[in-house]
């Protein structure tokens, strides 16, 4: 009778532990990284995003069109405490020239000054491209899929190493939520918290990155680009 009870209790506990443990679907994880690679290889896209940290936030609007000649329009807004600067930095590429509007100071130059040619194309770097499927799956501790939305618990140790391989970053929690449509990412949120220690001084880390990505067919540039001041060697 004791043996029977022991078996029953063992089975019961095993079922409960299995129910409480985090589930992980490697196919869903690989689907995310495949979608990430497809997204990074897009020839055109409009990207709206925010980078929120403990005491500040960046608002980003980037438009990239490079089916023919490279065109770029990007805008960065900055929020620091109660200070808000919506047009902190605006940058454009058009007709082989670059245009910069930094808080009202407008200058123009040529793309060769930033290491590009007139017919250059931008290539996004995929830091996960050389990892095996097993290594990619190790980056997440759990996964959940509901329709087109994928939710992952990120391995904090591996993410900390990606952020800083010197070992100064220690993370307590990290999650990633992504919406995948047509094998491409349309929306993504990454949150992580922890601490960073440099020279015995520690600072809390509380970061949230949110991106929305959609198709782009045309960029509407400001109509005063020709009036931007030409950069000189002294500038």
Question: For the regions a protein language model found, what residue spans apply to each?
Answer:
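Sec-dependent bacterial lipoprotein signal peptides
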Residues: 1-19
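N-terminal leader/targeting segments and the immediate start of mature chains
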Residues: 15-69, 220-235
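Extended lipid/amphipathic-ligand handling interfaces
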Residues: 33-38, 60-68, 89-91, 95-98, ...
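Short, hydrophobic/aromatic-rich segments at coil-to-beta transitions
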Residues: 41-48, 67-73, 146-151, 185-189
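Hydrophobic lipid-interacting interfaces of membrane-associated proteins
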Residues: 49-56, 77-81, 96, 103-105, ...
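An acidic-aromatic
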Residues: 63-126
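Flexible, processing/modification-adjacent segments and terminal tails
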Residues: 102-161, 168
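Gly/Pro-enriched, hydrophobic low-complexity segments
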Residues: 148-226
């Amino acid at each position: 009778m004791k043996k029977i009870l022991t078996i029953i209790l063992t089975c019961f506990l095993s079922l409960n532990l299995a129910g409480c443990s985090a589930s992980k679907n490697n196919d869903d994880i690989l689907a995310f990284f495949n979608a990430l690679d497809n997204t990074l290889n897009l020839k055109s896209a409009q990207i709206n995003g925010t980078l929120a940290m403990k005491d500040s936030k960046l608002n980003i609007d980037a438009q990239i069109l490079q089916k023919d000649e490279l065109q770029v329009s990007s805008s960065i807004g900055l929020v620091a405490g109660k200070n808000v600067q919506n047009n902190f930095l605006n940058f454009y590429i058009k007709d082989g020239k670059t245009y910069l509007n930094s808080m009202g100071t407008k200058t123009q130059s040529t793309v060769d000054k930033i290491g590009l040619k007139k017919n250059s194309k931008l290539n996004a770097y995929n830091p996960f491209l050389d990892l095996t499927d097993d290594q990619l799956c190790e980056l997440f501790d759990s996964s959940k899929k509901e329709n087109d939305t994928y939710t992952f618990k990120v391995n904090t140790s591996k993410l900390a190493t990606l952020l800083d391989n010197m070992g100064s970053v220690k993370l307590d929690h990290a999650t990633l939520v992504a919406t995948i449509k047509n094998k491409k990412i349309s929306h993504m949120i990454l949150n992580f918290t922890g601490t960073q220690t440099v020279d015995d001084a520690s600072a809390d880390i509380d970061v949230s990155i949110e991106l929305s990505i959609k198709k782009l067919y045309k960029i509407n540039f400001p109509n005063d680009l020709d009036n931007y001041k030409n950069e000189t060697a002294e500038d």
